[in-house]
Swiss-Prot record:
It comes from Deinococcus radiodurans (strain ATCC 13939 / DSM 20539 / JCM 16871 / CCUG 27074 / LMG 4051 / NBRC 15346 / NCIMB 9279 / VKM B-1422 / R1). Its EC number is 3.5.4.16. Pathway: Cofactor biosynthesis; 7,8-dihydroneopterin triphosphate biosynthesis; 7,8-dihydroneopterin triphosphate from GTP: step 1/1. PANTHER family: GTP CYCLOHYDROLASE 1, GTP CYCLOHYDROLASE I. PROSITE patterns: GTP_CYCLOHYDROL_1_1, GTP_CYCLOHYDROL_1_2. This is GTP cyclohydrolase 1. Residues 1-33 are annotated as: Disordered. Gene3D superfamilies: 1.10.286.10, 3.30.1130.10.
């Protein structure tokens, strides 16, 4: 597999400027503090008791981090990490950990993402794949959408011959409430270009990641 060159290098001037946009965060994330106090009172807690006095501040800080993807763009997280291709073989980045918040119950889901592409004229610094996954995971999300957004981003950046994204997640909204199935996991995929049209290419990718899938 070809390796991306050092990320400090200057990318070719002909590369497009990525245009996927983020959503600005509120001017004052601390607005979450009074809302958290109200929420604590609504569930029957005393927000002024010793163990909860600083909880609104902690919650506001935690949610600012867990949703920082809203305030970022694809161009910002990739920076100068796109380079001219030096090969055309499949590149696979496996076992990218992700953490996100379910938009339906605002409970966490987490797991691993595997991203592959077949270069055209451009390649991407390997660490940027993790940054792209974080960009879309750190929002209120569903796993299906993250999978599609990561594939869309790689396509926009590189115009490759093919892109594959496979994500496997454990959803606490399913494990700790509702049906309460702690051993269940969800797998989603997005296949583009050669990964969709050529069964051999798709099989090569699936074979490479098979051993990392949960329960395999």
């Amino acid at each position: 597999m070809p390796q991306a060159r050092g990320e400090g290098a200057t990318p070719p001037t002909s590369l497009p400027n990525p245009s996927l946009k983020g959503v600005p965060l509120p001017d004052n994330p601390n607005n979450l503090e009074p809302l958290t106090r109200e929420w604590l009172a609504a569930i029957g807690e005393d927000p002024d008791r010793e163990g909860l006095q600083r909880t609104p501040q902690r919650v506001a800080k935690a949610w600012a981090y867990m949703t920082e993807g809203y305030g970022q763009t694809l161009a910002q997280v990739v920076g100068e990490g796109v380079f001219a291709a030096e090969g055309s073989e499949m590149v696979i980045v496996k076992d990218i950990e992700f953490y996100s918040m379910c938009e339906h119950h605002m409970l966490p889901f987490y797991g691993r993402a595997h991203v592959a592409y077949i270069p055209g004229t451009r390649i991407l610094g390997l660490s940027k794949f993790a940054r792209i996954v974080d960009l879309y995971s750190r929002r209120l999300q569903v796993q299906e959408r993250i999978t599609t957004q990561v594939a869309d981003a790689v396509e926009e950046l590189l115009a490759p011959k093919g892109v594959a994204v496979l994500m496997e997640g454990i959803h606490l909204c399913m494990a700790m409430r509702g049906v309460q199935k702690q051993n269940s996991s969800t797998t989603t995929s997005a296949m583009r270009g050669l990964f969709r049209s050529d069964p051999r290419t798709r099989a090569e990718f699936m074979s490479a990641v098979q051993g990392t899938l949960r329960g395999r």
